[in-house]
């Protein structure tokens, strides 16, 4: 089964302290994602190129099928599977705090990539 890599750009709001944002992601956001079997997530910061100094959330899923289970295709309505909601609990306060640091998530221009080679 081919892995899926979800690429989500993160645009910080003006005046946000980057170290506080990074610490929030590490202590509050990443542990929630890592509770869900079949996925992991990484916070990346651009080092060179067009997005140097900007952030990206990389969500790695073990397969297309697992991605579709965790995040059922629902058109424009974002959500997660009921069993995932039960596993992670109420994450509304985390996303409310996230919105104090950055624009909405997932970003409207995200892309999921299916690995075609190792």
Segments (PLM) and residue ranges:
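A short, glycine/Asx- and small/polar-enriched loop/turn
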Residues: 51-55
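Short hydrophobic/aromatic beta-strand micro-patches
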Residues: 11, 58-60
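An amphipathic, aromatic/His-enriched active-site/gating alpha helix that lines ligand/cofactor pockets
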Residues: 27-42, 50, 60-111, 115-118
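Solvent-exposed, flexible loop/coil residues
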Residues: 8, 16, 105
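Active-site-flanking beta-strand signature of metal-NTP-handling nucleotidyl enzymes
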Residues: 3-11
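Short, surface-exposed ligand-recognition loops at beta-strand->loop->(often short) alpha-helix junctions
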Residues: 11-24
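Mature, folded catalytic cores of secreted/periplasmic enzymes
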Residues: 1, 14, 30, 49-50
């Amino acid at each position: 089964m081919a892995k899926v890599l979800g690429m989500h750009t993160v645009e910080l709001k003006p005046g946000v302290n980057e170290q506080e944002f990074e610490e929030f992601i590490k202590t509050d956001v990443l542990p929630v994602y890592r509770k869900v079997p079949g996925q992991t997530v990484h916070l990346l910061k651009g080092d060179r190129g067009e997005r140097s100094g900007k952030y990206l959330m990389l969500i790695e899923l073990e397969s297309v099928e697992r991605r579709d289970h965790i995040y059922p295709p629902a058109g424009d309505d974002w959500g997660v599977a009921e069993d995932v909601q039960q596993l992670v609990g109420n994450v509304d306060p985390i996303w409310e705090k996230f919105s104090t640091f950055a624009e909405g998530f997932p970003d409207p221009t995200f892309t999921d990539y299916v690995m075609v080679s190792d």
